Amino acid sequence: MKFLDEAKVYVRSGDGGNGCVAFRREKFIEFGGPNGGNGGRGGDVVIEAVDGLNTLIDYRYQQHFKAQRGGNGSGKDCHGAGGKSVVLKVPVGTQIFDEDRETLIHDFTTVGERFVLAQGGNGGFGNAHFKSPTNRAPRHANPGQPGEERWIWLRMKLIADAGLVGLPNAGKSTFLSKVSAAKPKIADYPFTTLHPQLGVVNADGREFVLADIPGLIEGAHEGAGLGDRFLGHVERCRVLLHLVDATCEHAGKAYKTVRHELEAYGGDLTDKVEIVALNKIDAVDPDELKKQKDRLKRAAKKTPLLISGATGEGVKEALRKLADVISEQPVSIKAKSTSDSAATEEPWAAPLPPQG
């Protein structure tokens, strides 16, 4: 299934049905009186968060959704039928924005959550409604009210417990494939991962969801590379695992490049708990490894973990530390406080330092 995390959609609720002008006509009843029924209510446009979806690809091929119009009233006090509503199904984690792409209308966070995006128009009154002691035979009825219409943006943000960040070719996809059943594309060239990937990880009996997003490069917030739009998928994460390639030219500079892009994106990403790990330690000699570790430690102001996604060295320790942070931090909390003792006791769990 193709991945799509943003779609523009047009929705229109149903118009209300018209009221009816009718009179009772029966044998031997000279003045039967009005009996025109009311129009039916138009259908709503409803959006529902469902389980089992992780893409908005369906809305690439169909962008227009219209609910059914309410039925017109008829004689013998028959009211029009209500219009059938339209239900748009989206993944959990989807946000609805107005046409300006900035005004948040609703955020879906739980399975089964429903939101009425456009209400159907009310049906018009038939002439029976207007009967009164002074007007025994009204000859007018109301038309149905028009429905609502609008353009909206659907934007999906994956719901994961932990997120993998780093430069392209930092080994994020290899790490994800090592610790979960996910099968991301792995190759020795930049931007192998073009879309976010999810994997379920089991660390000593504790399960959590890990998200791998495409790599960031310098200037990503200005559109370089694949840009930084995929960072939205780690906004809901409780902890970030920052992988730095031990074979790169300078581990400290690589770390700061990603940090700068996180700051430029915003979204409280820089306030999240971060675990820093030096990856691909099997591909460098001991002297170079020590040099890169020291560079990364100075840049991050914390002692990095040493891991290898290829051989599995240090991977279990990294998963345990991720699980520890996730178990301590509720889903609703987006950032770890600097006063939290759990964050200050362990150097790998300290909040991200401010960058000049």
UniProtKB/Swiss-Prot annotation:
UniProt binding sites for Mg(2+): 173, 193
The keyword Cell membrane is assigned to this record: no
A single GO cellular-component term on record: cytoplasm
Domain Obg intervals: 1-159
Keywords: Cytoplasm, GTP-binding, Hydrolase, Magnesium, Metal-binding, Nucleotide-binding
Segments for region (Disordered): 332-356
Metal-binding found in the keyword field: yes
Positions that bind GTP: 166-173, 191-195, 212-215, 279-282, 308-310
GO molecular function: GTP binding; GTPase activity; magnesium ion binding
Primary location recorded for the protein, binned into one broad class: cytoplasm
Cofactor (UniProt): Mg(2+)
Pfam families, alphabetized: GTP1_OBG, MMR_HSR1
EC number: 3.6.5.-
Domain OBG-type G: 160-327
Cellular localisation: Cytoplasm
BP term (GO), one: ribosome biogenesis
Highest taxon of the lineage: Bacteria
Family, similarity comment: Belongs to the TRAFAC class OBG-HflX-like GTPase superfamily. OBG GTPase family.
Described purpose of this protein according to its UniProt entry: An essential GTPase which binds GTP, GDP and possibly (p)ppGpp with moderate affinity, with high nucleotide exchange rates and a fairly low GTP hydrolysis rate. Plays a role in control of the cell cycle, stress response, ribosome biogenesis and in those bacteria that undergo differentiation, in morphogenesis control.
Complex formation: Monomer.
Designated name of the protein: GTPase Obg
Native source species: Bradyrhizobium sp. (strain BTAi1 / ATCC BAA-1182)
